[in-house]
Curated annotation (Swiss-Prot):
Subcellular location: Cytoplasm
Protein name: Suppressor of cytokine signaling 2
Record region (Interaction with AREL1): 1-75
UniProt gene name: SOCS2
Predominant subcellular localization, coarse grouping: cytoplasm
Any Gene Ontology biological process: intracellular signal transduction
Organism: Bos taurus (Bovine)
UniProt keyword list: Cytoplasm, Growth regulation, Isopeptide bond, Phosphoprotein, SH2 domain, Signal transduction inhibitor, Ubl conjugation, Ubl conjugation pathway
Amino acid sequence: MTLRCLESSGNGAEGAQSQWGTAGSAEEPSPEAARLAKALRELSHTGWYWGSMTVNEAKEKLKEAPEGTFLIRDSSHSDYLLTISVKTSAGPTNLRIEYQDGKFRLDSIICVKSKLKQFDSVVHLIDYYVQMCKDKRTGPEAPRNGTVHLYLTKPLYTSAPPLQHLCRLTINKCTSTVWGLPLPTRLKDYLEEYKFQV
């Protein structure tokens, strides 16, 4: 089962609960809510999280994009938080992201779910599949059995990313040992905030 949004009922402390539930006082989020909030905060820094967007709006954004271009948006299905919309060889398509027990993974049929990797954050999940697609992609050939390959290659940004973030991505692509670089500590801290290549 995936995470469902908890309905807040009543007034006062119960009504003030976060939509993801809290443990203890209204000021102190549960560990689960804190993990989820951290993952969503990280996602909001990417520049390719579009927030609330319909399926048709996502299709419109991706229709002229090259194959492999993707964006993350809020899911229109109440059992899921997020959806990946991606341009495939057959046109734009959507894939839900499942959140369960503090982990994110791609939604799939039950017999395959246990084999799919799980991640602490959505950005880590996307980064993993983008890197995997870079390693395996040899060309845009269509599969022979009628299935469509899902390639994640390039995010569709909501707006031009800040130069600082683009520099951080470039550094992340070149090294995984930020602390060995001859940079000020404050800059190293900034680089450590986002360790991904996408």
